[in-house]
């Protein structure tokens, strides 16, 4: 079976580019005037043809229906996320500020755990600086991190969620466990950010559908406790694209509304430096999935690998560069420290 993909490759900041007409990607601030139409059979790319907008549109009647869907998805305008009393627009980049209340996160483990006033002050500072959402996590998902009992995770997360909800902050909870999702929602959380894409806990899909809260589905090759395991790709970009398409479809089949699904290619999760860079360079392709995109590359290992093994707290320059790369690719949500 032949699979097709449309990758925008000539980006501009207006409908008119030097190369001619450009189309608006995902209703945002980025336009594209050239597109690669990629054909794949048996896991291998068999053709890659370059088109301008007019030529590609003229070819559409002769191409399979999935190409029509991808073309429409690339231009799909996303409705804002409704997060409690807050509305987060998706026609411009938005920031998720990371708040880890863990003892062992790779970047800031222990800094905010058991220090509620310090955690709240940091969250307030991020919101004041412009973060649209505060993303609270009670479990480290770095390589080799031990699993956390859901009761401990709830004890870490819920008090902070309650306090931030009282402040009127839009809150995301970063968890793989349905019990934590339930407790966080009851405490005032507005969004579930699941690094397992609702695979880890058999109750998660049903819970997300029942609550109606938006969800972030992230790619990770592993299952169970080790999300970084089983990393084997034929073409990392297209493999991740196909995987996210399946998780999107599983969420839709479970009853999660389409305008409640955000997709994340999972930078740094079970991927080599080359894999991560390939994904960063191909981010515009993922708009063809028809969902808002989230990218979290802040302070991650790939930055250290490119910056003379700089430790996590000295990766600001690389974090900014990758955030800007995501922004110029039309990514709507940037998860940052």
PLM feature spans:
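Catalytic domains of carbohydrate-active enzymes, especially glycoside hydrolases
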Residues: 121-137, 329-330
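Phosphate/pyrophosphate-binding loops at sites that engage ATP/ADP/AMP, CoA/4′-phosphopantetheine
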Residues: 128, 245-260
């Amino acid at each position: 079976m032949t699979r097709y993909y449309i990758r925008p490759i000539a980006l501009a900041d207006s409908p008119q580019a030097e190369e001619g007409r450009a189309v608006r990607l995902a209703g945002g601030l980025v336009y594209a005037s050239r597109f690669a139409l990629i054909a794949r059979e048996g896991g291998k790319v068999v053709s890659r043809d370059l088109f301008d907008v007019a030529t590609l549109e003229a070819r559409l009647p002769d191409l399979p229906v999935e190409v029509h869907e991808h073309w429409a998805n690339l231009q799909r305008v996303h409705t804002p996320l409704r997060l409690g009393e807050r509305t987060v627009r998706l026609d411009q980049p938005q920031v998720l500020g990371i708040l880890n209340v863990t003892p062992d996160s790779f970047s800031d483990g222990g800094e905010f755990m058991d220090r509620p006033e310090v955690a709240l002050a940091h969250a307030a500072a991020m919101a004041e600086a412009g973060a649209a959402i505060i993303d609270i996590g009670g479990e480290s998902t770095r390589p080799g991190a031990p699993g956390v009992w859901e009761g401990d995770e709830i004890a870490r997360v819920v008090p902070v969620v309650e306090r931030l909800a009282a402040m009127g902050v839009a809150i995301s909870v970063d968890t793989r466990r349905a019990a934590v999702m339930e407790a966080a929602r009851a405490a005032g959380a507005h969004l579930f950010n699941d690094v397992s894409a609702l695979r880890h806990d058999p109750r998660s899909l049903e819970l997300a559908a029942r609550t109606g809260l938006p969800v972030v589905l992230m790619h990770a090759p592993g299952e169970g406790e080790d999300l970084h395991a089983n990393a084997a790709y034929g073409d990392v970009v297209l493999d991740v694209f196909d995987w996210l398409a399946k998780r999107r479809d599983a969420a839709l089949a479970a009853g999660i509304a389409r305008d409640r699904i955000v997709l994340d290619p999972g930078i740094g999760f079970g991927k080599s430096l080359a894999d991560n860079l390939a994904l960063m360079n191909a981010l515009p392709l993922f708009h063809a999935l028809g969902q808002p995109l989230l990218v979290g590359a802040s302070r991650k290992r790939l930055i250290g690998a490119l910056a003379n093994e700089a430790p996590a707290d000295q990766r600001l320059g690389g974090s900014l560069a990758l955030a800007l790369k995501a922004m110029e690719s039309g990514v709507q949500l940037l998860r940052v420290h």
